[in-house]
Amino acid sequence: FLEHITYGEPNRLEGFLFPDTYDFYVNDDPDRVLEKLLSNFNRKFSDDASAQLETLNTALAERWTAKGYDESYIEAHRMTIYDLVTVASMIEKETASAKESSTIASVIYNRLCDPANYPYLNVDATIVYALGGIDGALTYEDTQIDSPYNTYNRTGLPAGPISNPGLSSISAALNRADTSYYY
């Protein structure tokens, strides 16, 4: 599942270090720790989730086709596991409520499927990530930060995951609510 990640990117494992309870030994080898975290993600992202990702791609392709986008556009925008984890990570940081997660996923996908009218995702959590955290509310100036994670001035998904999402956020990213919400 790491095939879409460029080696050497400083945040390349963000999103794949599954939040869970782990047992480690004092002075455990860092490579062993990473292997355990990544293996757990791989176990949690089951074959069923891979099938759900294909179903999601089919649904998104149908929406893009209905909006007049051609096959090359659709193929270039197929969701990978990396993309899915990126969406799930935004959901994870946008809400603490599992009940709202699938609606937030719907807003993200609705915007991704209508880039002519909604070129930017405008996800506040990506700005907070790009800034390294904030005290207080976001400002207009915050949304203008030059960062590949800024979804206020860059189209499509941010450069990568902004957190390590849990199962409920991954599930929401795979099973979005059926809404017409863009906000």
PLM regions: where:
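Bacterial extracytoplasmic/cell-wall-associated proteins, especially those involved in peptidoglycan
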Residues: 2-183
